[in-house]
Every structure is written in C-alpha cells, then in structure tokens.
Regions:
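FAD-binding core/adjacent interface of flavoenzyme oxidoreductases
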Residues: 1-25, 41, 93-145
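Beta1-alpha1 glycine-rich phosphate/pyrophosphate-binding loop at the start
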Residues: 20-89
Length: 145
C-alpha cells in the first residue's frame, strides 16, 4: 500500500461528509468487531472493505464450530451477521479498494480509487488470505476445509 501526502486536493472538504472519528480498513471479523466497539463508544465509524468475499471467512463454504452459532453456516453468511450487528450500532460500510494512506498527520487520510476520507484514528484489519494457489485444481477446493 503506498502512502500519500495530504496536498489539500482531496474531497474531505469543510462539510465533513468524509470525516470520521475512526476508519477501519478491512471488514472481516476483526474489522467488524472493532467497528462494534468504536460505534458503541459513540465514535463515528467507517469500514472500508473490498467486499463480502474478499477475505478468508467470506470464501469459507462451511463453518460448524463458531461460538453462538448452532449447526453449520457459510462464511459469507456469518460475516454478514457480523456486519449487520456493526451496522445496527451505526457503523457505515463501503465497498472500495484502499490505494493509500497518510498516517503521519494528526488527522489521518485514507484514499480509495474514487474518494478520500479523514479520521482521527485508522485501524488496519486487513486479515489474511494465505498463499496463492500452487497446485492445479486447488482453487475449486479453496474454502472447503
């Protein structure tokens, strides 16, 4: 991820539409959980994520051992439950790719392909996707245990 300097040409503007207390990069379990805690602390929170199936949980087809969930559930379905809970506390989610950040200033900036956002704090919760496929046919088994 490249770092940008804040040259004043972003869309944060004076109206504060893109200004938050906390921006969380990554909307998986860690990002959603962080969002729940920050929103419950009355902090205006934005989660920027590439999409519901961008992370390891989102592509997992079956989970049978998650606390509080009886039976089996798909990873994307479990992730949606987490996101719904975060949204119920006021977290805003957007689907974007983060292309850069400026974390050196007191007000932090996060840049996406189409916009920029500012916050007092940035949490990076990008998770993991592991290694790339190395065995022919591996992609058809990905997320199946």
């Amino acid at each position: 991820m490249k770092t940008h300097s804040n040259d004043g040409n972003n869309t944060n503007g004076e109206n504060g539409n893109n200004s938050y207390d906390v921006i969380i990069i990554g909307g998986g379990p860690a990002g959603a959980t962080a969002g729940i805690y920050t929103a419950r602390a009355n902090l205006k929170t934005l989660i920027i994520d590439k999409g519901l199936t961008a992370g390891a949980l989102g592509i997992t087809s079956k989970i049978a051992n998650y606390p509080g969930i009886s039976g089996e559930i798909g990873g994307a379905e479990l992730l949606q439950i987490m996101r719904d809970q975060a949204q119920s506390f006021g977290v805003k989610f957007i689907s974007e790719r983060v292309i850069g950040v400026d974390l050196l200033s007191e007000t932090k900036s996060v840049f996406t392909n189409t916009d920029s956002f500012s916050a007092r704090a940035v949490i990076i919760a990008t998770g993991s996707m592991g290694r790339v496929n190395r065995i022919p046919g591996e992609e058809r088994l990905l997320g199946r245990g």
